[in-house]
């Protein structure tokens, strides 16, 4: 991070932590909720990602409005309340039964409703394709049509993040070449890899000849020759 801040290109290949990178974990969480939306942690992660763009305050607003419902049901109820806001009879009935702790549909509420409407419309679109679309094709469409790929590429270390996303698509394509196919099986397969600490390591974005600072362990550097070497943490 320090080298990047100073404008010095640096490169370090990680042999672990691929599934824990932000961009990969969010994409996997999105696949999880396409398979089964009633998973609170993946749903919360996706809603606060570029897919949903919800703020912590908006997440708290949903939970406050429906404190006794499971989170997925609370989000759906909040979204449906926004869709029904023009129906006076339903709004009055909701106020009478006390289903929601909300008292008005302020501008902030309407902005949140629009976010949720867009989010669930996208989910419905992709979920309809799950039965007949190979996972790697589904992933590619999700990345491209939602703007997720552009979002992660614009983040710090964007080239590395984009390479990690591309690598996930490649892994999904390779998986489709096995006897196991479909979203459910792919999500389960990744879950098993994570359970047994099987990690791919982050995707490589530079070749051996790149004009850059290469960060590596002493063990990994054996047999290599560099004109300048900094050995950090020696005492």
Identify the residue ranges that each predicted region occupies.
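Flexible, active-site-proximal loop/turn residues at the rims of small-molecule/cofactor binding pockets
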Residues: 235
């Amino acid at each position: 991070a320090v080298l990047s801040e100073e404008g010095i290109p640096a490169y370090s290949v990680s042999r672990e932590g691929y599934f824990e990178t932000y961009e990969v974990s969010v994409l996997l969480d999105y696949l999880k909720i396409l398979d089964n939306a009633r998973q609170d942690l993946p749903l919360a992660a996706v809603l606060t990602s570029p897919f949903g763009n919800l703020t912590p305050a908006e997440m708290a607003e949903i939970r406050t409005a429906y404190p006794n419902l499971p989170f997925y049901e609370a989000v759906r109820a909040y979204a449906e309340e926004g869709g029904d806001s023009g129906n006076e009879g339903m709004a009055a009935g909701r106020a009478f039964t006390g289903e929601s702790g909300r008292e008005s549909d302020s501008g902030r509420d309407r902005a949140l409703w629009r976010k949720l409407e867009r989010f669930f419309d996208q989910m419905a679109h992709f979920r309809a394709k799950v039965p007949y679309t190979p996972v790697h094709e589904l992933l590619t469409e999700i990345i491209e049509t939602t703007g997720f790929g552009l979002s992660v590429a614009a983040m710090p270390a964007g080239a590395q993040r984009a390479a990690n996303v591309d690598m996930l698509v490649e892994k999904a394509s390779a998986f489709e070449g096995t006897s196991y196919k479909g979203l459910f099986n792919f999500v389960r397969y990744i879950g098993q890899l994570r359970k047994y600490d099987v990690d791919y390591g982050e995707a490589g974005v530079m070749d051996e000849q790149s004009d850059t600072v290469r960060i590596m362990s002493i063990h990994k550097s054996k047999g290599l020759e560099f004109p300048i070497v900094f050995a950090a943490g020696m005492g």
